[in-house]
Amino acid sequence: MSKALPLLTRQGERIAITHGLRTPFARQATAFHGIPALELGRMVVSELLARSEISPDVIEQLVFGQVVQMPEAPNIAREIVLASALSVHTDAWSVSRACATSFQAVANVAESLMIGHIQAGIAGGADSSSVLPIGVSKKLARLLVDASKTRSLAQKLKLFSGLRPRDLLPVAPAVAEYSTGLRMGDSAEQMAKNHGITREQQDALALRSHQRAAHAWQQGLLNDEVMTACVPPWEQPFEQDNNVRAESKMQDYARLRPAFDRRHGTVTAANSTPLTDGAAAVILMTASRARELGIAPLGFLRSYAFSAIDVRQDMLLGPSYASPLALDRAGITLADLSLIDMHEAFAAQTLANLKMFADERFAREVLDRPRALGEVDMERFNVLGGSIAYGHPFAATGARMITQTLNELRRRGGGLGLVTACAAGGLGAAMVLEVDS
């Protein structure tokens, strides 16, 4: 175990997370159809400020992320500042770390707090899979640039005369890794085969995720951390995630065909997280600033870590690499955790990471650690369900997980929680959260 690295300001104060909020998450082309990520982000930041009753002038920085970026608003963070009640003098910039984007946003605000540049900031992310930057072919794009340099209609017509009908077809955003051409689901299939994870195991985890998420909603556990959204055509408010299947059964999952490896695969639409729209954000500040404002924090950021691995083999094992680092930096072990929340991009990916947490050979030969983290107690794991049930607006998921875990720790009387995620490009993220008893 490496030496613990406490996250403290120069004055020795802890980094407090005082508030967290998200929109309900909506499956692609449903409740948020036509609502861009920028509007979702503005919506959640505005409501977060209103609920916190913190003066907008207190917030000195906004770090916000978006994975599927819109060309017309490349700095979503600054646009949210300008569209919300935040002061126009609020510093703002955008980040992208694929599915770990809001983890990165939280880390950036925490770093600003630690070095003393600010005393309070907001971190979060938003994504829309319903409002996408549909592009044009490379040939047409090049001709459009060339045409802008011509002077006469004849010159323009000559340029476009070489176009073919296929050159005019719209081009959707890529769903594959740029470096390998593999889709996320292809990597999940690879991991299922490499780690001996069966279709039944994947379906069982997916069913568990939906059952626990449905129970969380039924018990009102999420009411205070999910806002009601009112969007066009203003017919009715949108109050709960619409992907959670409360009545599903194992036989329902067994009926679906593989989505990626059609002949021999085990990854289906049901044991994967769906394309989703939504936004989430948290407020961070120094412990002293929270005291000055009379705010009791939800909890504290104890440590964080990021990792990067080869994209060609087990690309989604990021949690198995980042989590040991985060635990080391927090000065704790797996046994010290009250809760573990892992992003469920796919059931296969989640189960593979759980295996690697307990794999002694992986620890010694791959991580160069003397021992594995250990077996995960499933009674502490994704206790309210995970991304398979809630959905996954890429840049918003981390902030959802952080808020959800802090609130659950508070319900349990305090403790330590690990939140961790894989991300495209072979990236991983992990954070240790702390709630005082």
Curated annotation (Swiss-Prot):
It is an enzyme of class 2 (transferase). GO terms for cellular component: cytosol. Belongs to the thiolase-like superfamily. Thiolase family. Catalyzes the final step of fatty acid oxidation in which acetyl-CoA is released and the CoA ester of a fatty acid two carbons shorter is formed. This is 3-ketoacyl-CoA thiolase. One of its GO terms (molecular function) is acetyl-CoA C-acyltransferase activity. Its main location: cytoplasm. Heterotetramer of two alpha chains (FadJ) and two beta chains (FadI). PANTHER family: ACETYL-COA ACETYLTRANSFERASE, CYTOSOLIC, ACETYL-COA C-ACYLTRANSFERASE. It holds the Pfam family Thiolase_C. The gene is fadI. The active site is at residues 99, 392, 422. One of its GO terms (biological process) is fatty acid beta-oxidation. Gene3D superfamilies: 3.40.47.10. It catalyses: an acyl-CoA + acetyl-CoA = a 3-oxoacyl-CoA + CoA. Its EC number is 2.3.1.16. It is found in: Cytoplasm. The keyword rRNA-binding does not apply. Keywords: Acyltransferase, Cytoplasm, Fatty acid metabolism, Lipid degradation, Lipid metabolism, Transferase. Pathway: Lipid metabolism; fatty acid beta-oxidation. It comes from Erwinia tasmaniensis (strain DSM 17950 / CFBP 7177 / CIP 109463 / NCPPB 4357 / Et1/99). The lineage of its organism: Bacteria, Pseudomonadati, Pseudomonadota, Gammaproteobacteria, Enterobacterales. InterPro entries: Ac-CoA_C-AcTrfase_FadI (IPR012806), Thiolase (IPR002155), Thiolase-like (IPR016039), Thiolase_acyl_enz_int_AS (IPR020615), Thiolase_AS (IPR020610), Thiolase_C (IPR020617), Thiolase_CS (IPR020613), Thiolase_N (IPR020616).
